[in-house]
Amino acid sequence: MAELPTTETPGDATLCSGRFTISTLLSSDEPSPPAAYDSSHPSHLTHSSTFCMRTFGYNTIDVVPTYEHYANSTQPGEPRKVRPTLADLHSFLKQEGRHLHALAFDSRPSHEMTDGLVEGEAGTSSEKNPEEPVRFGWVKGVMIRCMLNIWGVILYLRLPWITAQAGIVLTWIIILLSVTVTSITGLSISAISTNGKVKSGGTYFLISRSLGPELGGSIGLIFAFANAVGVAMHTVGFAETVRDLLQEYGAPIVDPINDIRIIAVVSVTVLLAISLAGMEWESKAQVLFFLVIMVSFANYLVGTLIPPSEDKASKGFFSYRADIFVQNLVPDWRGPDGTFFGMFSIFFPSATGILAGANISGDLKDPAIAIPKGTLMAIFWTTISYLAISATIGSCVVRDASGVLNDTVTPGWGACEGLACSYGWNFTECTQQHSCHYGLINYYQTMSMVSGFAPLITAGIFGATLSSALACLVSAAKVFQCLCEDQLYPLIGFFGKGYGKNKEPVRGYLLAYAIAVAFIIIAELNTIAPIISNFFLCSYALINFSCFHASITNSPGWRPSFQYYNKWAALFGAIISVVIMFLLTWWAALIAIGVVLFLLLYVIYKKPEVNWGSSVQAGSYNLALSYSVGLNEVEDHIKNYRPQCLVLTGPPNFRPALVDFVGTFTRNLSLMICGHVLIGPHKQRMPELQLIANGHTKWLNKRKIKAFYSDVIAEDLRRGVQILMQAAGLGRMKPNILVVGFKKNWQSAHPATVEDYIGILHDAFDFNYGVCVMRMREGLNVSKMMQAHINPVFDPAEDGKEASARVDPKALVKEEQATTIFQSEQGKKTIDIYWLFDDGGLTLLIPYLLGRKRRWSKCKIRVFVGGQINRMDQERKAIISLLSKFRLGFHEVHILPDINQNPRAEHTKRFEDMIAPFRLNDGFKDEATVNEMRRDCPWKISDEEITKNRVKSLRQVRLNEIVLDYSRDAALIVITLPIGRKGKCPSSLYMAWLETLSQDLRPPVILIRGNQENVLTFYCQ
């Protein structure tokens, strides 16, 4: 346990107001022994502060678990509490280490650092806490709101008609099928909402944080739009009822259509005013609407028990009758909508309102409790009400009635048909002529007619429609506000601003109002409803899929406290929601899915920088893990060989050409790892290692290079590369090729660095790697051109100064991207391959993969091989035959018969002058002196080594002459890398070979040597 000296008085409560001070944390004093536990001070065990260094009675900066350490935010005016970092607990305590802790503290606002304390008591803040926003419980905030949104105009005006068409049995099936979808969705949303702290944004917040910004953003936008259109639908339903009343009393305003528009616009304006008054007033209005609906229900039920008057009897109401109930059990389809799915499509929108409570999640006291409890209770009670009304009204009212008081049964006036005959009424004439204006199947206002006092039903219609419209208005603005704050789409941030203590989305209300007015102009309920239903169903499908996907990923982060859900039920809910979308209105379903896909593709293209820990991310990990483990069971086969490259880039932005070259042929094909060795003491380079890794990865992503970045700390370069070659990769996904840049300054650099460079190539062969060395005429390192050497992020040791740990890794991403030859079109040039020695085919495979890419596809590939002048035709045919079996598409083959001729004298002398400074000149020295010189300078070339390697040295000089003759204008030159035997070829001689081989060549030169194992085959198994 980390301990600190007791520097304050133990009993002084005023000093125990924080966890620790920076000065105490970084004190260089020797720690004192742990303080003994004092039972007279129980606060030692209960006080959350460790400023007095008392945790379980010990003198330590280690802290006990507390809520604040895991919270992302604090209450207004309260300081943020932080736990000590790992460095705080186990690093040396000294003043020089202050910069190690600065990052942890400086990120907080200045008001959180009071009097040098890391944290203080909330009561010490001089700022007065702002007024608390209004928060609602599960009844007022969720259940009532959901019930009001579920109940709507269909309950009063269409449910009796649906019962008459489908019969009581099928109506119950329609209701229960609809409730099945909403109940499964309710269970799914309950699970999602209890898997962590829920903020404002409702359905959008839940889906986006579960499935990610791609699907979440698209569904959030259309869900907000659907709610805005829902305002229009419900107000139009309200306006239709008012218009009918005006016409009944002979007081129309203008004409039927414009009356609806006028009434609806006035109504939605009043609802806007209620919303702008704040959530508190909106909630009061909802409670008032709820009471009105409850009174209307009671009024209806009482009315069914009252014996019918003559007026009601003439309209088909006869109170509870068994024969009426039996007759209305079976369907009687009429009209164009007279089908099961026709009735289902009309009823289903009345079940969609279960998200009203979740949509104001930011205004709930405890969303994790309120959303599941309130939503499921709302579904239960509204289902009971639908079933009860369908059964009761189907037991009281016949399907057809004339409404004429004189249509009583009169003896001698012919046959009387129908159940009404037994009750003294004859509706035969209007039934046969299909001219009845009343009855369950003809009169939409049947509930008003049956009720004890008709105006109360009208008031219930008003309450149901206006409350639903108000809930939709609030939901649209709240969801859209959260979407705007996340900035997933352009040009909408303006509407995200909140006002007042509740952060009311005033601008969102105005936008929803404008959309509602635009759709109110349509003034046709049957045109508006299908679009909304499909958007809501699309939301339900994604909510259920979110729950299913989060469950199957087995992510440790999926721990919902609501356990009464099932992943397969959630999947069924998602599928059935999509099916219902097409059953309701196929064209509206296609529109909804098309909009979702368009918005989805936009967010995928933009790649917003958000990280919400979505189940999609967890699923990606699961897939990667599963396939990676599965690869362990796959035996290696030549046909499945892929060039998996470990590229020694250092900081990738230093050598963009090297990154682009490898990234071109490995893209969507194989593994690429950019390796970076930080040289120096582990303690010194560790802060830099932690800071820059993420920045380099983002740089690669910005450059559209599909690669990993891996860095290690080592005492020297060679040891670091050895670590990378042994540890990089995972399972079968391990590098098999080492790619390095050519050491251009080898003649002027310290010989030890050259020794390390060549040693790295030898190590690669020892680890059975292939080797690829890339040389460009202008060099690979662009750090000086970018002036990166003055930035400690890029190379902190370059100026010989200690790197500061305070570095902004975003500088790596924001820097200007250097362009390279591998990013441009190559045109109709050539890729020349000098396949001088058989390395297993890697020298052929890399250019082939490069030639498949669009920028290199127009290049003609030429293959050059060595041969004898008297066997040129035979050798050429043999190579062409071999290449055709490899199916590489290489048809132009050139034999080099003069490869073993002596080079020109001036070129030979140039080579000798190149190695002269590195010669040991041991011809006249004794053996002891030579051995000592060799031990001190292993890179030196002895006379014996020059003699033994003379033929090989002259071959490199001659090859350079040949390449200059044939490939001066090529786009790329690929040459088999010569190998120097360990212990027989000094590093300086080997570097001279590579220098000579690629000297004066204008195109990029790639020196490749495989590990002498086949990477190409012409067999099919």
Swiss-Prot record:
Coiled coil: none annotated. Changing N442S: In GTLMNS; 68% residual Na(+) uptake activity; partial loss of localization at the plasma membrane. It comes from the Eukaryota. The modification Phosphoserine is found at S43, S49, S73, S91, S126. InterPro entries: AA-permease/SLC12A_dom, AA_permease_N, SLC12_C, SLC12A3, SLC12A_fam. Glycans are attached at N406, N426. The chain crosses the membrane at residues 138-167, 168-189, 221-243, 256-280, 281-303, 339-360, 372-393, 454-477, 508-522, 528-544, 568-587, 588-599. It catalyses: chloride(out) + Na(+)(out) = chloride(in) + Na(+)(in). Its main location: membrane. Changing N149A: Reduced sensitivity to thiazide diuretics. Reduced sodium and chloride ion cotransporter activity. ATP binds at L648, R655, V677, G741, L780, N781. Changing R1009A: Abolished sodium and chloride ion cotransporter activity. GO terms for biological process: cell volume homeostasis; chloride ion homeostasis; chloride transmembrane transport; monoatomic ion transport; potassium ion homeostasis; potassium ion import across plasma membrane; renal sodium ion absorption; response to aldosterone. Polythiazide binds at N149, N227, H234, T352, N359. Disulfide bonds join C416-C421, C430-C436. Changing S91A: Decreased phosphorylation by OXSR1/OSR1 and STK39/SPAK. Homodimer; adopts a domain-swap conformation at the scissor helices connecting the transmembrane domain and C-terminal domain. Interacts with KLHL3. Interacts with IL18R1; this interaction is increased by IL18 treatment. This is Solute carrier family 12 member 3. It comes from Homo sapiens. The lineage of its organism: Eukaryota, Metazoa, Chordata, Craniata, Vertebrata.
